[in-house]
Amino acid sequence: MLMPKRVKYRKQHRGRTKGDAKGGALVMFGEYGLKALEPAWITAQQIEACRLAITRTLKKEGKLWIKIFPDKSYTKHPPETKLGKGKGNVEGWVAVVKPGKVMFEIGGVEEELAIKALEYAATKLPIKTKIVTRHHIGGEAV
């Protein structure tokens, strides 16, 4: 599972997810990408499930880039615990994803295979997504 090696503070505030993604909204490394259309916390387990889905579909062809990393901890109290008694223990790690963020990119494969892999990965995520391609402006890739 993906998680930070070290963090300054183990427990974080929940925060708010408002607005669109400031960076990472374009396909930069590969030819095809999976873009988020809704805000969400994507867990390390969901990222790993998507990675497995894509790599199994590609079968050692092409290259995969994972452009999100779960660097935010979330906490949870044990079941049947009374309120109070401080913040719960760290349960796992999430990546905060805003609308417009390209989460996964694929390059070096045919279009049909890339779209098939990304569609399969999209079923592993709790949000609406769309498949995007690299934009070519004036004959050059952007």
Swiss-Prot record:
- Glycosyltransferase among keywords: no
Please give the Gene Ontology molecular function terms for this protein: rRNA binding; structural constituent of ribosome; tRNA binding
Q: Which UniProt keywords apply?
A: Ribonucleoprotein, Ribosomal protein, RNA-binding, rRNA-binding, tRNA-binding
Transmembrane intervals: none
Q: Name one GO biological process term.
A: translation
GO CC, sorted alphabetically, is: cytosolic large ribosomal subunit
Query: Which cysteine-cysteine pairs are annotated as disulfide bonds in the entry?
Result: none
Q: Does rRNA-binding count among this protein's keywords?
A: yes
Stretches of the chain forming a coiled coil according to its record: none
In terms of Pfam families, this protein maps to: Ribosomal_L16
Among PROSITE patterns, the record links this protein to: RIBOSOMAL_L16_1
Q: HAMAP family under this entry?
A: Ribosomal_uL16
To which protein family does this belong? Answer: Belongs to the universal ribosomal protein uL16 family.
Job of this protein: Binds 23S rRNA and is also seen to make contacts with the A and possibly P site tRNAs.
Q: How does it assemble?
A: Part of the 50S ribosomal subunit.
- What is the protein's given name? Large ribosomal subunit protein uL16
